[in-house]
Swiss-Prot record:
A zinc finger (C4-type) spans 752-778. GO terms for molecular function: ATP binding; ATP hydrolysis activity; DNA binding; excinuclease ABC activity; zinc ion binding. Keywords: ATP-binding, Cytoplasm, DNA damage, DNA excision, DNA repair, DNA-binding, Excision nuclease, Metal-binding, Nucleotide-binding, Repeat, SOS response, Zinc, Zinc-finger. PANTHER family: UVRABC SYSTEM PROTEIN A (PTHR43152:SF3). It is found in: Cytoplasm. This is UvrABC system protein A. SUPFAM superfamilies: P-loop containing nucleoside triphosphate hydrolases. Belongs to the ABC transporter superfamily. UvrA family. Forms a heterotetramer with UvrB during the search for lesions. Gene3D superfamilies: 3.30.190.20, ABC transporter ATPase domain-like, ABC transporter ATPase like domain, P-loop containing nucleotide triphosphate hydrolases. GO terms for cellular component: cytoplasm; excinuclease repair complex.
Amino acid sequence: MNQEYIKVRGAKEHNLKNINVDIPRNKFVVITGLSGSGKSSLAFDTIYAEGQRRYVESLSSYARQFLHLQNKPNVESISGLSPAIAIDQKTTSKNPRSTVGTITEIYDYLRLLYARVGIPYSPVTSLPIHSQTVAEMVDIINELPKGTKVYLLAPIVRGHKGEFKREIMNLKKQGFQKLIVNGEVCEIDDLPKLDKNKKHNIEVIVDRIVLDENLGNRLADSLESSLNLADGITYLEIVELPQAVKSQFEKNQRITFSEKYSCPVSGFQLTEIEPRIFSFNSPFGACPKCEGIGKEFFFDRDLIVQDQRISIKDGAIVPWGSTSSKFILETLKALADHYKFSIEVPFISLSQSVKDILFEGSGEEEIKFEFHDGSKTQIIKQPFAGIIPSLQEKDRTIESVLIKEELAKFKSEHKCTACSGFRLKDEALCVKIANLHIGEVAGMSIAALQKWFIHLEEKLNQKQLFIAKRILKEINERLKFLMNVGLDYLTLSREAGTLSGGESQRIRLASQIGSGLSGVLYVLDEPSIGLHQRDNTRLIATLKRLRDLGNTVLVVEHDEETMYEADHIIDIGPGAGIHGGRVIAEGNAEKIKHFEESITGRYLSGRQTIKVPSETRVGHDNRAIELLGAVSNNLDNVDIKIPLGTFTAITGVSGSGKSSLMIHTLYKAALKHLEPTSKVFPGKYRELKGLEYIDKIIDINQSPIGRTPRSNPATYTGAFTHIRDWFVELPESKARGYKVGRFSFNVKGGRCEACQGDGLIKIEMHFLPDVYVKCDICNGHRYNRETLEIKYKGKSIADILMMTVEDAMQFFDKIPLIYEKLITLNEVGLGYIKIGQSATTLSGGEAQRVKLAKELSRRSTGKTLYILDEPTTGLHIDDIKKLLKVLHKLVDMGNTVLVIEHNLDVIKTADYIIDVGPEGGDKGGKIVVCGTPTDIAACKESHTGRYLKQYLI
């Protein structure tokens, strides 16, 4: 008998306080609560981890060695558990070979479709290429009127230069009597002399036949002989037609037969049409030049000389650095003397011809170089190779990976010139369905692709339709699922590494629905992230469909609409960190509203809200940043004006062009202007005005604050520097002569050398996951005994790293340098995290807020432009309230804050809104409306305005 609930008893993972909870099976369940309250600890680190662990444990020891076995979570028991699948926010893959098409398997079905019903065309002549068996050829010939005289020809030479004496001699030996040479019938013993410098066509007359019913096997035998002579190609030439018979055929008409996929005119051949030739991950299909990546990398002049305002002598040529190298300096001086230019003037002032010589070389022109080595002088006259050819040679010959990585910094990415970015060989791209090759189809948006497949059935013949029916069904279903999760703007060729966390999660969600599994526990992490309110309804319908297939859908979510649609809600809290970890409320949305202790309930009931500001800021004296003519990605020659000294929101449906406009164009262009040596490449635009009003532009994104466990909030914000300085000044430290390095766990001296300051020892286990155990020398404290003896208020430096931000604030309340760093972490809602918590354990939203805290603690100039891409990711509405307070504080200090956001509680507090759209992908990239929240709500064309209206009431 099936159990009705997943029963969790005694869950104590991370901050969970011995939780007991019953989760209804085969229902849509939302786990909510403040950021850091313990939602993920319950959903992912307890329930999913145990479900996955039990499944892997059930496998043989041989199979287990290839799988990662989860550690047993800190829980007494879980019953009623199903096999678990986690669909989290982590980006799918950074591998450039992984695309939306390969992840969803749509591309696999496309390959099969093209292999089975695609028609190959010659890339030279555009003629269709057919492959036929001898039996099919015989059937076609038998359709000719009886009594027709035909020649069966073997084209042994097609448009090639030469005399072909050997070939003609071989034909004589085989007994052939007549040839057609350049259109003239000739006896083989009486051939005209062939000009070896001209192109010729030579066909062997294999057989002369009058078609009737008594040919027997003669026709098939002659065809086989002809095909063998001409490498699988033969011509049938109609010499004479019966006079009394009307026919579609004409005298002297030629019919081409090929047992291979071969163009009879150009000779272009296809050896096979199988799914593998359409795979850019297979040597049979990948473009040989780019090896299936679709891109080439070339040394770029703009990367070699990144700041043209400085001189060559001062290091304008970045790979050569400053001219401290005597050899380089003497080389450049010789060039300057020869071409009459100075290496001490700004690079921008050099003539274009001099720049061309520097980059590409002097060609065959020799230059006199003088090299001095002490008392010796060596004079060499030779051409100058050029910076780019020199770098290319070094890149080709050097074996050092480090040097190759360094050289890669001076290369830019371009579409492959051989395959035009389609990744495939010519053989694959010549196969078409409805006049499109597979690369063109993969480059269409999901929405356009769905329409194309609907109309495709009308364009296929009965045979093709019969073959393609099941393939089309699979493709159409997967496209529908992608449409339902709001990804209609993506293309199948989009690289997986360029997707946001929310996009990659929804792709995997669509794939899971396509798999049709039932009896599974799905655990999802905020699937609504990055999704416009318009598409949220479709996403919820998708989650419900997953439930209706007979699965339990467990979603960590903050979205109100999702909570109202859920069958059951579990609210974890009441606060974050040590203040959370308890089940505060359970039930549907209506029940949650009435729990007084539930912060979620207070917002659902309206007892607590984020208020709309009574007035909006107008900015500094009409000063603004203007970006004109932006055309990056799908942007359609966009002009925007951002008033300075305001809180501005960039809105629009997913894929409309918000990030292309703000991150890839505005941010990168402004950064390149303010910091010319920065290695960023802005999207194309015409003009950028108003940068004289700002001195800094900062992109506060969700990338990790550190890649190693040694990075933590204290080190990132700079608080740890002041803490170490404080410990050095303690009397006991001074008496022992300790320096700052003594209190670092990154260098020798004060750290525990047994674990090298990690506090943990990694033990490799056969058939089991690696185990991390506390270092038994320092007991996990990271430092050696002598360092831990230094204490302030009875606490060692290791004790302080284990404190939460809130505790550390109280502990250092009398030390302003430390307190000011910590209070900003608390202001952004991170009071619950430990100041020494490993950076690798922080979520993207937490990492973003740590960065925001660092910016808050800096001395403000009031001339900074901050850009944040979806800062509400992972935030409860109460956390959003705190975040808005911080962002508005930055604006009140004179700065400008620009947020790309879907959350309507954030959008309604903006001073100015730029709505991009109206749709995603090709149908986006325009400015729908700009203005105050009231202006946006009044715009009928704006999807954002339609939903924003009810938030302004």
